[in-house]
A protein has these predicted regions:
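Broad phosphate/nucleotide-binding scaffolds in NTP-utilizing and phosphate-metabolizing enzymes
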Residues: 1-273, 277-279, 299-310, 315-323, ...
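Helix-to-catalytic-loop junction in kinase catalytic cores
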Residues: 283
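Catalytic-loop of the protein kinase fold
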Residues: 287-294
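Short amphipathic alpha-helical recognition elements used for nucleic-acid or partner binding
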Residues: 328-331
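Conserved phosphoryl-transfer catalytic core
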Residues: 339-341
């Protein structure tokens, strides 16, 4: 089944000048709206000004997201990354609008994809494959096609990077910096600059498909013999820096009706596997797949003999964390698990979340918020609300209202004056942890996360 003509594009705009001009135009238009707004807002009451300011910010944010979406390529990927991590340096209206940048975007026409395949693999290798011209999925940086190796019928998945995407990353980052600066949308310049340096390096890594092939093989090696997980096999013969070919691994999305209808025991099995994978990355591997997107996972239902399994699909965003971050962060998790507040704060200060000379009530308020974040992984649930536990005393991930409770406690703690900009590594780690929580919550699981964590703390 092919996509409608209006959902397919012939080429990606990759020229430095045309992409830079599109971003500059968007920034100029967005910035000019501020001048118009200031004039019309001059005589408004304070309440009206606040309402008008929020309305303007929302309109400007939606316009910016719309313009970024038109360019596809790394601009869209950068926007999606800002949606995940922008809470540290952008207004909420901006991150909300950026969440509308759909990952499953318009596909590139087969002729352009075929040209890319020929350039990267050559006609001789392509002759060994039958490739479905209709993609399984289209994203911001490339699209995925199903294929078959002719000689033995091996089912394959081929990820093809869009032409010119890798070359446009740096110019796209510079254009977005210009856009946000002209639009006056950055709330924390220091956080913005720190995140952008890290994000730029991460995106360059993500478009190196040979690195992703290595990451995939590393994960497969680390999970050898663990029947809870399926890692696709890499086919190096049909891979390059811009092409990644793996075994085709079918499965259901976690939100599929069949998954939701599984028994609690089976859903718990999958949820524990998801949490255990993250904890293995954190405590054993030292390398973490930082992208929390649900699209990176599939569920393969068992047949009675084989258990239900998680299919792990994307290792492009694997990140190796330095020991000077990992060790204190692990210690923070351990201290929060055991409710050892002094040890927790000692490591938080080591990571410069807090400072030792801050008022004691500020330090304790920070510890309160952190203990609540780690609540599902606690050694015991003495301080957990009754509604978050089932009759067996097991944690009800979907019913815990944890995000709402954490947000409320954080706002009441008045930490903004003291809370330092976290290390850049924390931005990625925190988002991954929240992604794992969300995955487990979506499965409607009921189990004590501390039981999964404790084996890593011995």
């Amino acid at each position: 089944m092919t996509s409608p003509p209006d959902k397919r594009i012939k080429r990606i705009k990759t020229g430095f000048f045309e992409r830079r001009m599109e971003m500059a135009k968007a920034g100029f238009i967005s910035g000019s709206k501020i001048l118009t707004h200031s004039a019309t807002n001059f005589w408004a009451s304070p309440e009206e000004k606040e309402r008008n300011n929020k309305k303007l910010m929302s309109e400007r944010a939606q316009y910016m997201a719309s313009e970024m979406g038109k360019l596809k390529g790394s601009v869209v990927k950068i926007g999606q990354m800002m949606a995940l991590y922008g809470e540290y340096f952008l207004p909420k209206e901006i991150t909300d609008a950026l969440h509308t940048l759909e990952e499953n975007t318009a596909e590139l026409e087969w002729s352009a994809i075929e040209t890319q395949l020929l350039q990267e693999l050559g006609a001789h290798k392509l002759a060994k494959l039958e490739i479905d011209e209709t993609p399984l999925a289209a994203a911001s940086l490339g699209q995925v096609h199903r294929a078959r190796r002719i000689e033995d019928g091996q089912e394959l998945c081929i990820k093809v990077q869009y032409p010119g995407v890798a070359k446009s990353i740096d110019s796209d980052f510079n254009a977005i910096i210009q856009l946000l600066t002209l639009s006056q949308m950055i709330t924390s310049k220091r956080a913005f600059e720190q995140w952008f340096r890290e994000a730029r390096a991460m995106l360059h890594q993500e478009v190196d498909y040979l690195q992703e092939a290595h990451n995939t093989e590393f994960a497969a090696q680390m999970l050898t013999g663990d029947l809870r997980y399926i890692v696709p096999q890499v086919f190096r013969e049909f891979s390059s820096k811009k092409i990644l070919t793996t075994s085709y691994e079918p499965g259901l999305v976690v939100t599929a009706a069949k998954v939701k209808k599984l028994s609690l025991r089976r859903r718990n099995h999958l949820a524990k596997a998801s949490l255990d994978l993250f904890l293995s990355e954190l405590f054993a591997w030292g390398e973490i797949q930082t992208d929390p997107n649900f699209g990176n996972y599939r569920v393969r239902l068992g047949d009675g003999k084989q258990p239900d399994q998680l299919v792990l699909l994307d290792f492009g965003a694997m990140k190796k964390f330095p020991p000077n971050f990992l060790n204190p962060f692990r210690n923070m998790i351990s201290a929060a698990h055991h409710n050892r507040r002094d040890a927790f704060l000692e490591n938080a200060i080591a990571l410069e979340f807090m400072r030792a000379d801050y008022p004691e009530d500020v330090l304790q308020n920070f510890a309160d918020v952190a203990m609540e974040i780690i609540e599902p992984l606690a050694a015991n649930y003495h301080n957990v609300p009754d509604f978050a536990l089932n009759p067996k005393g097991e944690y009800r991930w979907a019913e815990s209202k944890l995000p709402r409770r954490v947000a409320k406690k954080a706002s009441q703690a008045s930490l903004s004056k003291y809370f330092a900009l976290p290390p850049k590594e924390f931005m990625f780690m925190n988002r991954k942890l929240m992604g794992v929580y969300s995955f487990v919550k979506t499965l409607g699981a009921e189990f004590n996360g501390g039981e999964v964590l404790k084996k890593y703390l011995s």
